[in-house]
Amino acid sequence: MMSLLSLLLLGIALPATQAIDYRKCQASQILKEHGMDKVIPLPELVCTMFHISGLSTQAEVNNHSNKEYGIFQISNNGWCAEKQEDVANSVCGILCSKFLDDDITDDIECAKKILQLPEGLGYWKAHETFCIEDLDQWRC
């Protein structure tokens, strides 16, 4: 009886928002709809996203003193804000928690800003390690 009650309470406590785990071609299509194919080759970007977040909208990683959020693993180190009062000082002008919802439009807009950096996709270390060569499996 106690374990049934525990499971019931756990079910109530879980957040209502479910993660979306995209498949590579779904992600590629959404990125194309938002013009990302004009910014960066989609196979490289989808490969990178897969290796940093598993293409999951609710991926959240503690990385030393920083925290990274969402499908693009956007860092709270200047790109987004942990607290509402810090939003205006962040590059993307958004709360980091917004990168954990199922609407990735704001994630994409922030990623476009990151891609304007001189290192481009190199901002994400997984790109250089996994997504430079042999990208056939990431094409749709």
From Swiss-Prot:
Mammary gland specific. Secreted in milk. Residues 20-140 form the C-type lysozyme domain. GO terms for molecular function: calcium ion binding; lactose synthase activity; lysozyme activity. Ca(2+) binds at residues 98, 101, 103, 106-107. GO terms for biological process: defense response to Gram-negative bacterium; defense response to Gram-positive bacterium; lactose biosynthetic process. It is found in: Secreted. The keyword Transmembrane does not apply. Pfam families: Lys. Its main location: secreted. Glycans are attached at residue 63. Disulfide bonds join 25-140, 47-131, 80-96, 92-110. Residues 1-19 form the signal peptide. GO terms for cellular component: extracellular region. Keywords: Calcium, Disulfide bond, Glycoprotein, Lactose biosynthesis, Metal-binding, Milk protein, Secreted, Signal. Coiled coil: none annotated. Regulatory subunit of lactose synthase, changes the substrate specificity of galactosyltransferase in the mammary gland making glucose a good acceptor substrate for this enzyme. This enables LS to synthesize lactose, the major carbohydrate component of milk. In other tissues, galactosyltransferase transfers galactose onto the N-acetylglucosamine of the oligosaccharide chains in glycoproteins. Lactose synthase (LS) is a heterodimer of a catalytic component, beta1,4-galactosyltransferase (beta4Gal-T1) and a regulatory component, alpha-lactalbumin (LA). Belongs to the glycosyl hydrolase 22 family. This is Alpha-lactalbumin. It comes from Notamacropus eugenii.
